[in-house]
Amino acid sequence: MAEQTLLSKLNALSQKVIPPASPSQASILTEEVIRNWPERSKTLCSDFTALESNDEKEDWLRTLFIELFDFINKNDENSPLKLSDVASFTNELVNHERQVSQASIVGKMFIAVSSTVPNINDLTTISLCKLIPSLHEELFKFSWISSKLLNKEQTTLLRHLLKKSKYELKKYNLLVENSVGYGQLVALLILAYYDPDNFSKVSAYLKEIYHIMGKYSLDSIRTLDVILNVSSQFITEGYKFFIALLRKSDSWPSSHVANNSNYSSLNEGGNMIAANIISFNLSQYNEEVDKENYERYMDMCCILLKNGFVNFYSIWDNVKPEMEFLQEYIQNLETELEEESTKGVENPLAMAAALSTENETDEDNALVVNDDVNMKDKISEETNADIESKGKQKTQQDILLFGKIKLLERLLIHGCVIPVIHVLKQYPKVLYVSESLSRYLGRVFEYLLNPLYTSMTSSGESKDMATALMITRIDNGILAHKPRLIHKYKTHEPFESLELNSSYVFYYSEWNSNLTPFASVNDLFENSHIYLSIIGPYLGRIPTLLSKISRIGVADIQKNHGSESLHVTIDKWIDYVRKFIFPATSLLQNNPIATSEVYELMKFFPFEKRYFIYNEMMTKLSQDILPLKVSFNKAEREAKSILKALSIDTIAKESRRFAKLISTNPLASLVPAVKQIENYDKVSELVVYTTKYFNDFAYDVLQFVLLLRLTYNRPAVQFDGVNQAMWVQRLSIFIAGLAKNCPNMDISNIITYILKTLHNGNIIAVSILKELIITVGGIRDLNEVNMKQLLMLNSGSPLKQYARHLIYDFRDDNSVISSRLTSFFTDQSAISEIILLLYTLNLKANTQNSHYKILSTRCDEMNTLLWSFIELIKHCLKGKAFEENVLPFVELNNRFHLSTPWTFHIWRDYLDNQLNSNENFSIDELIEGAEFSDVDLTKISKDLFTTFWRLSLYDIHFDKSLYDERKNALSGENTGHMSNRKKHLIQNQIKDILVTGISHQRAFKKTSEFISEKSNVWNKDCGEDQIKIFLQNCVVPRVLFSPSDALFSSFFIFMAFRTENLMSILNTCITSNILKTLLFCCTSSEAGNLGLFFTDVLKKLEKMRLNGDFNDQASRKLYEWHSVITEQVIDLLSEKNYMSIRNGIEFMKHVTSVFPVVKAHIQLVYTTLEENLINEEREDIKLPSSALIGHLKARLKDALELDEFCTLTEEEAEQKRIREMELEEIKNYETACQNEQKQVALRKQLELNKSQRLQNDPPKSVASGSAGLNSKDRYTYSRNEPVIPTKPSSSQWSYSKVTRHVDDINHYLATNHLQKAISLVENDDETRNLRKLSKQNMPIFDFRNSTLEIFERYFRTLIQNPQNPDFAEKIDSLKRYIKNISREPYPDTTSSYSEAAAPEYTKRSSRYSGNAGGKDGYGSSNYRGPSNDRSAPKNIKPISSYAHKRSELPTRPSKSKTYNDRSRALRPTGPDRGDGFDQRDNRLREEYKKNSSQRSQLRFPEKPFQEGKDSSKANPYQASSYKRDSPSENEEKPNKRFKKDETIRNKFQTQDYRNTRDSGAAHRANENQRYNGNRKSNTQALPQGPKGGNYVSRYQR
């Protein structure tokens, strides 16, 4: 019952799994197929035959038979498809093209489907089977129908045959079944392998094997398995015997030997049984235990494959892992490599999500709550990660050490190349899995290459090598020398090695038997497409092969050097390197030697081709090819890491590491390095230091990368459009550093870039050229060089070199590298071109539409650059080389219209050298034909013109003192501790100085004689027109050209012209008013040159005046010149444009040492400068103006009056006398006015003091205590003056006034002076609220909050726009400062010594109440003298002019004070009598700016004076006295005084002044002495004016 239920369930399940198909749902037996069965059956047979794999055929047959059985089960009699048709169709499927495998597949699927289709009709099935005889073989094997097809006799026979074949053993195939037989077989095999003559006994051993097999009925398959297993253990030494044994055995496929050297026959031939045995054994090895046995067995398999015993695919298809698994692993590995290639590319900050403020608290709580859970999750994640990583390692180990990958590796090692190449072509990404595959394939290629490499490269390198040393030993007591014996050992490692006296060679020497070496370079090119195309960039893992190919390429190009086929050969190698060699350099692991070998080949390529290869690698290959992408990313990250660690401390260690990385993979590592240089200043110097370890390949790529970055599309100027971008400057400095410190660095292409981009006026090219000249050439411009150094620079060679070192001009030290830099220009014939380009750019810079300041700066820069470049060329090129590389004088002048100063500057040194070396040389020969079109030679002598421009400062000036000074400096050096070599060097230097000094003196004498001879002619023709032409075309252009030329012009005109002509020239130059125009038009450097010229001229003229060479008329003329120059300078400085002021200051900076001389001129100049400073806002004008003013004022003490400079006329003398009298009268009048004002002020103050004393009577003050607070007319002492408003109005107060008011209150709150801050409040209601608040008892926190609320409300009533951000910032400051205040007791309820205490100890009143009526200096912590404190309110009108509207200090006595002397009048605080801090600070700043004559002269001093130590010991109370004598120097400094006053005030506040009541008499005595001790009479003397008294107080000053 249970069985029927189970069967019914299975039946129902099968129906669900395979539902009956209707013709409409059928995929093969559709209704159309059934209707046209005769034609469609043939099509179905063809479709079946077209299927290739067995899996596809099985699927197709399964579907077909399911549909057939479904159709047959319907029993449709009207159907055109009969059972016989189905049988015929099945026979056709089986017998189609007579393939046996078809019958097996069709039969098996027929049986399988018939067993699975539910509700099948057995009779119909049996009938169908009887009609298909071709399936009977399969039916008898597997189907239950076989019993229905046989009769009784056939069934009996079948049982007998089955019993005999299935259940009776004929051969033993298990070792345990016949251990004796298999044991003897193994023993025989071991004996055979140990037999040294086994190779000659192969037949005998094979016969014995057959004998054992027959004797013990051993199974042949198991016997073959045993032979293979045993032989694998002896494969190292016995592989030859093993192959010979198999060849003679029956197992050898003699009729169909496998051919594994042909792509088409890799799956044909061989012993299939042996292949299955080998595959099975390879799959059964335990990798952890049988690794060594597995490798030996694998090597045996490779030998069998190579000899054709088995075919490749019979092993490949059956060895683990399956291709699906391997491909999945490769895909995962590729994904990991992709992730690694993008590692560090994404910015983690850019991808990080910002956290909102609202969620921060929740997230923190969640972190706290879930801390334990997170820890557990983290531990579990780490555990899972470890397990996963171990699983990955296990999988990788299985794939690499066992199975298919291992098979490919060992096949390559044994020289079986074709199968491996076939697989790698089909699955090229297998190389990702194993690095060894590429190495082993490269080993094969290197074997093929070695004969060609030996024949083409130098083969005699090892002929001169010495033989190995002999070994000395004692044999049988005899000393003998024997050669070293090398022991050879066979190993399974493919690469031979030598260790000490042991040589390890590969055991299978026939591995290369099927390999044919290359015979020519063409063979190399042809076979590289086979081998290297598969290896790809992994060729970089075989650096020796890479080097050999590169050397062959070098030898091939050198062999064809000079032939017509050279270009063809180079083109072939360019393509070869581009495809095979260069991509492999990226995978070299820190091997700069290999890249150097590659570059030795690439050096023969044109740089355009090299740069194309570099660019292709950077932009395409490194992005498309995954191994290159990974390598590039790795190198880039490593370069960035080293750059971060690179510093001065680590440069010695990290530089070599960094250089090794860059020399190996420069394209990947130099780009981040150069970008780092662009962004940071200090990196450049470190990288330049590192570059000295680069190889040539890195230098070439570095030049390419620099050009790439220089031509990158980005702005070269900053946002202001004026200054160059920082990256341009940094790259320029870096390039210059490379050219200076790296002699192997080739910058020829950068020079080409400079040359080509200069045509477009590129600022980058200008910047690079400038840095090259400064850094490499060591050239320094002559701007800001003093006159002494200029003269030394134009002296003999020793002085010139010394002066150059003083100004940091290192051209002499950099001669070698500067000559190398010059060679880059000469190689491209670019010297004259660059000179003309820079000259043209200079002209264009003057015509641009920019601010004059910018144009001037650019013009100076371009002039300096051109001058420096010419100096570099003249220093490096001498004689013939200079003449060959620089355009002739005439061509520069006539064709290219180079200006006269530049043309002569270029050729002047060459002309001097030619004249000195060749006496017959004539300058006319050189300049003959030169057309000076801008010079009217009819009005000026050509001889004068050419002589003026040809000569240099060296020729016309000789100063012996310069040579003597240098000689004395060298002679004075302490030579006692010097070495002999250094002493000798100093002696030689002194000798050179003497020799060059004599030579210079001779040249100067020769020039002087020449000029003296020519001057006779020049002085004859010296009219006004000639002078103007001379000034216009000679003096002015050369003065503006350079500092040395400016001095030359001065020396020349003094040397070449007589005094009268000299005066005429100078008179025309000065009185023509060209100085002002010149200074406006010229640049800053040219203004300095003009200053040098006038400095020397005026210095010489002044020297002539002092020496008496000038008469009165000449002195008067000189004064007129000084006046004209002063007038022009003042006019220039009075201009509002920038150029006039700046150039005027620059001119005066040089001239001010000798000019002006007259005191009035100096005063005029510095007065003009001071007037300019009033409204000047430009810092580059203010700073030099201030310095110039100081210098001019310092010269006033040595300045001359006019009568000291020259004789005055009678009219001038009378005017001087009248002026002095008028000045004296003005001075007397001012003194009288001041005295009168002081007297009026003093009387006014005395009257005020008297009225205050009367009002401060104690009874009256108590009665009117509260009323005094609200009185609006108290203390009013001026009539008809407006009353101060009781309440500020926002409409009346300006914003600046409000902010100052807020700052004042904040100042006192910050220093905890709350009462002072309250006293500044201008609102009576708010003042009352604050006073009331200070009386209440409350916590300090509430007190501060309430105070803040009142102040903030008060401030907001003063301003129209409370939302103003500056005002809000002031309120924030108020909130911070309010935290500093503490509770201060109110005066009437607390200590008698408080801020506003009314009755205190007062001093006895003097006659004039001069010392009474106010708080004592010690008694008021608010006391301060006239203050310079700018934090006080600045918009409150003077108290002396208005009645007091603020709340006054309380006048009622303190409750705690018992002393009440009614005879003493209370000293009220007044505007001029001992004011407190709060009252004094409320005065206007303008009051303190008044003259001393306008202020009240009777004031208390700023600080109290404490008595000496004796009085302090006698009485603890220190009565402070006010010193009436001269104030100390410290009192003149408000800041120090203020600080000291605060210290004394704090000290007094800490004392207990209640103790002073016990010493009243003494106290009053001290007071009387203090106030009246210095009086000489009962009447106080009125203060004296500036002329009165011996002492002038600080207030009168």
Swiss-Prot record:
**Classification via InterPro entries:** Tho2, THO_THOC2_C, THO_THOC2_N, THOC2_N
Give a Gene Ontology cellular component term annotated to this protein: THO complex part of transcription export complex
Q: Where is this region: Disordered?
A: 1250-1274, 1384-1597
Indicate the transmembrane segments per the record. Answer: none
**Which key words tag this protein in UniProt?**
Nucleus, Transcription, Transcription regulation
Provide ranges: composition bias, Basic and acidic residues. Answer: 1458-1490, 1500-1512, 1522-1545, 1554-1567
Q: What are the GO BP annotations of this UniProt entry? A: cellular response to azide; DNA recombination; mRNA 3'-end processing; mRNA export from nucleus; positive regulation of transcription by RNA polymerase I; positive regulation of transcription elongation by RNA polymerase I; stress granule assembly; transcription elongation by RNA polymerase II
| Polar residues bias locations | 1419-1430, 1568-1582
Give the superkingdom in one word: Eukaryota
Q: Where in the cell is it found?
A: Nucleus
State any single GO MF term. Answer: mRNA binding
- Subunit notes for this chain? Component of the THO complex, which is composed of HPR1, MFT1, THO2 and THP2. Together with SUB2, TEX1 and YRA1, THO forms the transcription/export (TREX) complex. THO associates with DNA and RNA in vitro.
- Function per UniProt: Component the THO subcomplex of the TREX complex, which operates in coupling transcription elongation to mRNA export. The THO complex is recruited to transcribed genes and moves along the gene with the elongating polymerase during transcription. THO is important for stabilizing nascent RNA in the RNA polymerase II elongation complex by preventing formation of DNA:RNA hybrids behind the elongating polymerase.
Q: Which family does it belong to?
A: Belongs to the THOC2 family.
Its UniProt miscellaneous note says: Present with 521 molecules/cell in log phase SD medium.
What name does the UniProt record give this protein?
Answer: THO complex subunit 2
Question: What gene name is given for the protein in this entry?
Answer: THO2
